[in-house]
Amino acid sequence: MAMKKLYAKTSFTSKKPSSAANSTPILAYHQQQHQQPGNGICEFQVVAPGHSGELMIRRSQSMHHKMSPPVGGLGSKSEYYSIEELQELDLLDYRHPMYHHYQQQELRQRYHEHEQLVLQLPKATSPKAGPIYEAPQRSQQQQDQMLYVPTAAQRDSSSSAAATSIASSSTLTSSPSPSSSSSLIFSTLRKCVSPSNPSVNPNQPSKTQPSKLGCSMSFSIRTTTATAATAAAANAATATLSTQQQQQQAQQQHKQHLYSNIHHYLIRQQQQKQHYTLQRRHNSVKDKFIGGITTIFAEQSIIGARASVMVYDDNQKKWVPSGSSSGLSKVQIYHHQQNNTFRVVGRKLQDHEVVINCSILKGLKYNQATATFHQWRDSKFVYGLNFSSQNDAENFARAMMHALEVLSGRVANNPGGPPTNGNGYEEDMGYRTMTSEDAAILRQNNSIGGHVTPSAQTPTSQTNQNNIPQSPPTPQGHHRTSSAPPAPQPQQQQQQQQAQQMGQPGSHYGPTGNGPTSNGLPQQVNSQIPPAPQQQPQQQQFQQQQQQQQYQQMVQAGYAPSQQYQQPHYVLSNSNPNLTVHQYPTQQAQQQPPQAPQPPLQNGGMYMVGHGHLPSSASANSVVYASQQQMLPQAHPQAPQAPTMPGPGYGGPPVPPPQQQAENPYGQVPMPPPMNPSQQQQPGQVPLNRMSSQGGPGGPPAPAPPPPPPSFGGAAGGGPPPPAPPQMFNGAPPPPAMGGGPPPAPPAPPAMGGGPPPAPGGPGAPPPPPPPPGLGGAPKKEDPQADLMGSLASQLQQIKLKKNKVTTSAPENSGSSTSSGGSGNYGTIGRSSNGMASMMDEMAKTLARRRAQAEKKDPDPEAEVKKRPWEKSNTLPHKLSGGAGSGSAGSGHEGANGNSGGAGSNTTNSGGESPRPMRKRFGSASEETILKVNGDGLSLALSNGDLDTLKAEIVREMRLEIQKVKNEIIDAIKSEFNRR
């Protein structure tokens, strides 16, 4: 009842309650003749008002009826409108049950003539093609009966036939047959007369079209040969037969049309449904379920991390776990390639419950409350992610920053942001396995990388970009260095391609190690990064083992670095190993033969550890170095020397490192051809290389390297004492490496252009991950940071150099402490730029702790401790690789290899281990061992006053750099707003 009223509502304009019949339904269905329910549906059937089976509407309920009262004579059914009347009055609206049927009926009538002309084809049984206008088909019996009278008739002209048929039909008008039969006959005659050759041979009834037979029947009677009686009888018989047959034909035709039109109607309905479904697919919630078909192909995971997803409860004023229970979840950022949108999706590791599924909107404020707890809000909730490790947190933060930059238009979004993709592959952390599509992309990238590497400069710049993005990921302590993509955003576009290449470097990877020297360097970088994504777990272990062996070899002989060189190529940390190797030779040359190899080992080991830890902080460093190296190859083959610079810092005099580089690189060149050429070309430019390496990470362009050389030039010019500052710089560079990850953002390139030191500071802020490498990592980072944060690194290094010159006797210690301090500053700056205020707090705490320890310990140990805290703060994620390397390895290898050897081996171990144990080692054992190792090569003479002065100076420099970074960020934001 309710539905009928609803259907009828719009059909009646009267809304007065008095006009509605409460006792009876508005729509009444008359069922007097229920036996013929289908008659009302027939397309061509004329439905009389009040015909059975039609829906009637009360006239009293229509305003139209009141305006124009009905004419009498409608009988008992005058109370209701017929469907035809409703159609005429335009009162049959779409809610009427028969509305759609009659809509279709109108369409069918409109196209009926067209269907007759085109769609009604003759049957296959007829040998001849009949006229276009066909009468309905008839059975053979009917045809024989029709042929009985005109069998003897001969064909006449069409005009005489027409006259005869008209006369005969006119005589039949008085016959008892209904008057409608005459109209049917006339229509048939018209159809028969219209063809040019309507005459048909009646002797072949079975072979002729029924329409032709009918026509011949109608006009084959010859008045000239037949008597009037014969003609009248023939005409009567013809009229009767034609009337009956045409009625039957009309029924059959109606059925055919009805069925065909129903079929068309159903097809059209299906098409409409499909059309609506396609439209609805974009807006329906059901089609957006996680893992749905639409998301599988359109969305790609750019980062994955383990974290507990929390939601802030305003009522309870506390954080509560999202979902039904607490526990770790796999949180991923998905990038929709087509819509260029991002969203965060988290599933419980235990039961795969979806605990977060929120969009990342433009302008989202991502707050890194602490090193491992990040939060943001949307229109409904305040989300918090409590990450299981700092590496995960930093990687995720970088991916989030990259997504926000892509959304804001600051970063060109290539095929999904290679950096992000790189993260997706490398960052995998066991969360995401390579798909066939990923493998194909990696293979394609590898082939591209192979072509690019042949050109030393072009590949270098690309590799630098790749390395830079990846260096941040490496710092995170996971091969996934997927964080690299977030790194230099200016470079991200190139990084996207190269990051994928690097991610693919599985193929790149082995070959590049032995590829062209200058190209090989970039390739190494690529290969380092690429393996991480595909083979992170196995490769990390394998690399760690190789690196450990390499470290031992390095400790035993100065040539060991070259082995590391090649092996690193084999491993993801190829480029880093090369750097390490070069550094090793430098240190060896600089330091006493026994001690020199050991310190190089530490430096190299640190670097190598970085490589071995490619997943860990060391890998980030190696990435930075690789990028630096690549940068250097463009400007100069200084890239190899960049690693050496850290070596000289440890070794002591910068000059010896270049020599060693020349020596060892040459000896090692065969092993790491890519690195060697650049090293050979600029053995004396270690400082420049290093600076350039610093600049390189900061910005892919060659210009970046030149600015670093000046700062390094000071160190190199200083002579052996300057090397100590370089060492400090080396220590400092790790912070830049940290910065390197974030620097990819616009800040890094400006820093590169303006001056490596300042630029790295700005970009460096985002990449805190690099610090994790530890002491060894710190020196390593020094270079990457210099690349990424040229300005900060150079300024801090200059200040440190001054301090070191004052205390040249203990350049290593001061250098290490400075480097640690520099790392801390860089890391802090980077984090601050990333908005990680917690990093500053953490650094302050570590500084206080280190100061307390330094007061208890000797000045040298204090410096070491200080260095560690800085590194620690900088490389919190990398502590395992860098710090642990120095701490744990320090105890094992430091005795034989010196501080750097121990750090190297330790780093290797830490790569496999979790960052926390490494941090502990770094904090406890590595400090003393590092101090001892540093003391072995150089005299340690730093008073507490000197340390305090150095600390104060570092703090001042940090503040200045932070202020600069803030100003740069503000300027960048202003320029962005002005652009819009």
Curated annotation (Swiss-Prot):
Annotated spans, EVH2 block C: 947-980
Region EVH2, residue ranges: 791-980
Modification note: Tyrosine phosphorylated on multiple sites by Abl kinase. In vitro, phosphorylation on specific tyrosine residues inhibits interaction with Abl and Src SH3 domains.
Gly residues biased stretches: 882-904
Sequence segments annotated as region (Disordered): 125-145, 194-213, 448-547, 570-614, 630-927
Subcellular location, record wording: Cell projection, Lamellipodium; Cytoplasm, Cytoskeleton
Residues modified to Phosphotyrosine: 425, 607, 625, 650, 666, 826
Alphabetized PROSITE patterns for the sequence: WH1
Modified residues (Phosphoserine): 905, 914, 924
Pfam families: VASP_tetra, WH1
InterPro entries xref list: PH-like_dom_sf (IPR011993), VASP_sf (IPR038023), VASP_tetra (IPR014885), WH1/EVH1_dom (IPR000697)
Keyword set, alphabetical order: Actin-binding, Cell projection, Cytoplasm, Cytoskeleton, Phosphoprotein, SH3-binding
Known role: Functions, together with Abl, trio and fra, in a complex signaling network that regulates axon guidance at the CNS midline. Required in part for robo-mediated repulsive axon guidance. May be involved in lamellipodial dynamics.
Protein name: Protein enabled
